[in-house]
């Protein structure tokens, strides 16, 4: 199985992050994100976190949190990651992290997905083509509660924690949502 998420912001001790998600403390948020993640993700699953995985100077605490997550973790760098080479190095040392990259392309069947931290316009000029011939951008960054926030700009779907009740999203489910809306997307 392939899961996606973005903007865990583990250990980000700012009320505008954890309070907005309905938590009373950063520790409560951390514990609940790990719990919800591990409730659906198994050790053999692939998980793409599309940026801003953790915050704070305590890299060892961040490493322990990431290593407590099930699955083979693929990290797409976010805006908080690029500024911290030490954080990137910590990600690379986590036993369950299999790659740390700026962006990625993956496929599910014939459907291509472009994974990035920031929403990326994949184009509306191919709206006459079938869905399988188009590229879907999966992203984060905005902390939106609506995964379809940018659909007017292209085939863009948000996987932030806020949009999915602080849980990872199954790639098969995302593709099915697009198929269900295919006529509407033209």
Give the predicted meaning of each segment.
Residues 92-186:
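Conserved beta-sheet core of the metallophosphoesterase superfamily
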Residues 3-5, 10-105:
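Core catalytic region of metal-dependent phosphoesterases/phosphodiesterases
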